[in-house]
Amino acid sequence: MIEADRLISAGTTLPEDVADRAIRPKLLEEYVGQPQVRSQMEIFIKAAKLRGDALDHLLIFGPPGLGKTTLANIVANEMGVNLRTTSGPVLEKAGDLAAMLTNLEPHDVLFIDEIHRLSPVVEEVLYPAMEDYQLDIMIGEGPAARSIKIDLPPFTLIGATTRAGSLTSPLRDRFGIVQRLEFYQVPDLQYIVSRSARFMGLEMSDDGAQEVARRARGTPRIANRLLRRVRDFAEVKHDGTISADIAAQALDMLNVDAEGFDYMDRKLLLAVIDKFFGGPVGLDNLAAAIGEERETIEDVLEPYLIQQGFLQRTPRGRMATTRAWNHFGITPPEMP
């Protein structure tokens, strides 16, 4: 199964996900969840504004769909500056980055999504820009080539990544602020779902919002996507009002269970339990057993299963926990 085909994929793959931008928080006071990140950023932003400085460079990492782009927009809004957006794969040549940097106004924010995918050539250009606000570029070719320095206005680079471990040390060390986004708690997601329902003009009970939040895998992007599908079900099968029962019916129909697992999650866990007797099983064997790429398992399927205590990574391989066995109503084997 392709990741983009999953209803509970946290990737931005659907046109309606773009519409979520209209309901995203624009200021820190509207930002729900991530209390430690919010309180720290409030202090850092106020301090930078008091000094009249650009905010220090910021690295945001964590699983997809948790609001890295939203936080970048909030930082720019709070600082009262422009936000320029790009992504690592788009910046193929040093000239691409140079063009963006030379068009920045003082204190502007440059947001680079998937910053771990920057090419080494582009990354080299970024180092002096981050550290000294200078751009070193080569003019000409061969023996006639020469290096010139261009002064840049003070700016803030915000890098976002789902794979912080893939960043090179020189790049990672140049970020003065590093923030990790965690999966959201159900009460915070419930607030987000209720807020989105109001923006969409839906009539939704508190327990209906809670039911959607419980199955959203701790991820706001997934919560909003599930809300739209529940809305469709409520409008076609009922009178449009969303209660807990209607939300549960809709999500059951979509094969999203009470833990927020879909077909692929259950397939992975059942493979570990049925084919490998609960594990441990190596990643390559597991990938072959369920017909998925190992990168998909590591980056997409595993993080939430591990965070929720259904799967363990051990030196010998992946293991299903007692909670995973119980989820399927299967008696776990006796421990020796």
UniProtKB/Swiss-Prot annotation:
Residues reported to bind DNA: R294, R313, R318
Domain of life: Bacteria
SMART domains: AAA (SM00382)
GO terms classed as biological process: DNA recombination; DNA repair
Main location (coarse class): cytoplasm
Annotated residues for binding of Mg(2+): T69
Catalytic activity: ATP + H2O = ADP + phosphate + H(+)
EC number: 3.6.4.-
Record key words, sorted: ATP-binding, Cytoplasm, DNA damage, DNA recombination, DNA repair, DNA-binding, Hydrolase, Nucleotide-binding
Positions with a binding annotation for ATP: I23, R24, G65, K68, T69, T70, E131, D132, Y133, R174, Y184, R221
Top EC class, one word: hydrolase
Cell membrane in keyword set: no
Keyword Glycoprotein: no
Ranges where the record places region Small ATPAse domain (RuvB-S): 185-255
Alphabetized InterPro entries for the sequence: AAA+_ATPase (IPR003593), AAA_lid_4 (IPR041445), DNA_helicase_Holl-junc_RuvB (IPR004605), P-loop_NTPase (IPR027417), RuvB-like_N (IPR008824), RuvB_C (IPR008823), WH-like_DNA-bd_sf (IPR036388), WH_DNA-bd_sf (IPR036390)
MF (Gene Ontology): ATP binding; ATP hydrolysis activity; four-way junction DNA binding; four-way junction helicase activity
UniProt region (Large ATPase domain (RuvB-L)), positions on chain: 4-184
Region (Head domain (RuvB-H)), start-end ranges: 258-336
GO CC term, one of those recorded: Holliday junction resolvase complex
Subunit structure: Homohexamer. Forms an RuvA(8)-RuvB(12)-Holliday junction (HJ) complex. HJ DNA is sandwiched between 2 RuvA tetramers; dsDNA enters through RuvA and exits via RuvB. An RuvB hexamer assembles on each DNA strand where it exits the tetramer. Each RuvB hexamer is contacted by two RuvA subunits (via domain III) on 2 adjacent RuvB subunits; this complex drives branch migration. In the full resolvosome a probable DNA-RuvA(4)-RuvB(12)-RuvC(2) complex forms which resolves the HJ.
Family membership noted in the UniProt record: Belongs to the RuvB family.
Function comment: The RuvA-RuvB-RuvC complex processes Holliday junction (HJ) DNA during genetic recombination and DNA repair, while the RuvA-RuvB complex plays an important role in the rescue of blocked DNA replication forks via replication fork reversal (RFR). RuvA specifically binds to HJ cruciform DNA, conferring on it an open structure. The RuvB hexamer acts as an ATP-dependent pump, pulling dsDNA into and through the RuvAB complex. RuvB forms 2 homohexamers on either side of HJ DNA bound by 1 or 2 RuvA tetramers; 4 subunits per hexamer contact DNA at a time.
Domain observations: Has 3 domains, the large (RuvB-L) and small ATPase (RuvB-S) domains and the C-terminal head (RuvB-H) domain. The head domain binds DNA, while the ATPase domains jointly bind ATP, ADP or are empty depending on the state of the subunit in the translocation cycle. During a single DNA translocation step the structure of each domain remains the same, but their relative positions change.
UniProt-recorded name of the protein: Holliday junction branch migration complex subunit RuvB
Gene symbol of the encoding locus: ruvB
